[in-house]
Amino acid sequence: MAFSQKLSLRAYSFSFKKWKGKNPEQTLPLNAKVIFNRLQDGEERTYEYTSAFDLIVDFIGANMDVDDKEVRQQLFNCSFDSTNQGEKDTYRYLIFTVYAGYYGYASKLVNRKTKSTVHKKSRDEADVKPFYVVVVIPKDTEISKAQRGLILFQEIGIYGVKTVTTKAMQEFF
C-alpha cells in the first residue's frame, strides 16, 4: 500500500486592530475604509484602501516577486489570478497561492525506485512548494459590521505556510 501525504486545510479567524503604542486600541470593521502609514523605500507613505479585502489583494500584489527571507533562510512569494475571487450574498472571498521553501543546507534527491541520486541540492537551492490560501470576509448586515474574517491555509503533511505568510502580512500591514 502506498503512503500519501496528508492534504488538509487549517482555519484561523483574523481581525485588524488599530494600535496605540503597544496596545490595541480598537478592532476595525473589515468592510470599512482602511488608512495607515507604512515605510516604503525609507519614506513613510499613507495608504488608503476601500476595505480589508483590498488591503489583502495589495499585500499579494506586493509579494509577487520572490523574497529571500535570509534570517530564516526561506524563499517566499505569492501569485493571484483575479478570477479566483468573488462574492456571495453574505461574504467575499479570494484564493491565492503562496510559494515557500527553505535553503541553507546541502542534500540530495534520490529516486525511490532506482535508489540513485538524481540531483545534489546546494546550500543556495530551496525546495519551493505551492500552497493555497483562502480568505473569506463576511459582508456587513443592517445590525452588524464584520470585524472578523476567516483564513484557510493548505497543509501537505508537515509542510505549510501559515507562519511565513502571517509574518509577511505583519511586516506589510
PLM region spans:
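A generic structural motif
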Residues: 150, 154-161
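Intrinsically disordered, low-complexity polar/charged tails and linkers
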Residues: 1-140, 147, 155
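Generic detector of ordered, mature protein regions
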Residues: 107-109, 151, 164-166
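A short alpha->loop->secondary-structure connector
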Residues: 159-173
